[in-house]
């Protein structure tokens, strides 16, 4: 397997996870426990990291949905994929910071950072 193909496969995995996040933020029909976790944690992350935006929790949810849609578009397009991976890595850094500030487990964001980092490294 070539390194570019490996990077593309990892990118599609992150694309799929971002699409799952969009779905989980909008409805709990397919992922009830993931949706519930996002709904419970969103107000905490809003207070810990995004307080300076001064927006409601529901508005922040749609900001996250928009960001995840943007990540999907960037990772789907071969021309934009390299930028999309770097953009995603930056966003995951914010998520990791938020986890640390709230005393949450950093493992989910670290796994995603590792996957994105590997996709960037082999590209």
Curated annotation (Swiss-Prot):
Disulfide bonds: none
Signal peptide: 1-24
Membrane topology (UniProt): Multi-pass membrane protein
KO phenotype (gene knockout): Abolishes the production of xenoacremones A and B.
The keyword NAD is assigned to this record: no
A GO term for molecular function: isomerase activity
Pathway it works in: Mycotoxin biosynthesis
Subcellular location: Membrane
Family statement drawn from the similarity comment of this UniProt entry: Belongs to the cyclic ether formation enzyme xenC family.
Role this protein plays: Cyclic ether formation enzyme; part of the gene cluster that mediates the biosynthesis of xenoacremones such as xenoacremone A, a compound that shows inhibitory activity toward the PI3K/AKT signaling pathway and which has the ability to induce apoptosis of A549 lung cancer cells. Within the pathway, cooperation of the hybrid PKS-NRPS xenE and the trans-acting enoyl reductase xenG is responsible for the formation of the reduced tyrosine-nonaketide derivative. The alpha/beta hydrolase xenA then accelerates intramolecular nucleophilic attack to give a pyrrolidone derivative.
Protein name, per record: Cyclic ether formation enzyme xenC
Gene label: xenC
């Amino acid at each position: 397997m070539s390194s570019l193909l490996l990077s593309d496969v990892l990118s599609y995995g992150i694309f799929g996870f971002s699409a799952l996040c969009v779905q989980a933020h909008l409805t709990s029909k397919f992922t009830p426990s993931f949706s519930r976790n996002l709904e419970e944690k969103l107000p905490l992350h809003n207070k810990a990291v995004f307080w300076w935006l001064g927006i409601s929790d529901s508005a922040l949810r749609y900001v996250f949905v928009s960001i995840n849609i943007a990540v999907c578009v960037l990772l789907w397009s071969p021309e934009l994929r390299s930028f999309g991976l770097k953009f995603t890595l930056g966003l995951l850094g914010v998520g990791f910071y938020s986890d640390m500030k709230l005393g949450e487990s950093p493992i989910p964001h670290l796994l995603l950072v590792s996957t994105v980092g590997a996709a960037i490294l082999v590209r």
